[in-house]
Amino acid sequence: QPIEQLDMFRAEPNTYVFRPADGRETAAAYLSALRLAAPSVIALSRQNLPQLDGSGKSAMKGGYVIGHEYAGKKLDAILIASGSEVDTALEAKKLLEAEGKNVRVVSMPCMELFFEQDEAYRETVLPKAVRSRVAVEALGGMSMYKLVGLDGEIVSMEGFGASAPGDVLFKHFGFTAANVAAKVESVIAANKC
């Protein structure tokens, strides 16, 4: 199982790596790749993914808020995901909201494009003041540390995969809404100190 490949591609200079979460993000990835004067990698899922509310043109900025927090209330944490894990992050957000947490979900289909946006835009998506961040990616997660910082955590593959139906493997490796929500709770608690 090639869990390290996207980290490897992300480490290559002048290469754009896209991991879209649904059909609209896939279209945005293709349009972006056609406009770039650099190599692009578009990593698609074999799973049937739901069409997500709020996805679309904003994906062309590389990262955007797909699950908004409650306005007027302190933001407790930010969940960052790409590909098939964006839906899992949105489900984890629902669980956390039921516990009274105010959480934002950011879809990050292309980190390279996101970091090319101006500072003002990046701050609207990932405000520096919010240190409680959890990134979710069913791959090796080394490149996600750029997004979560020293105070965040990553739910990622820590070893090679296995052979079984996708839903069985996601549960086995902890890529469930319940596990992601528990990780967010842990990060929030750790950052209160």
Enumerate the predicted regions with their spans.
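Hydrophobic, small-residue-rich alpha-helical packing segments that form membrane-like cores
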Residues: 8-11
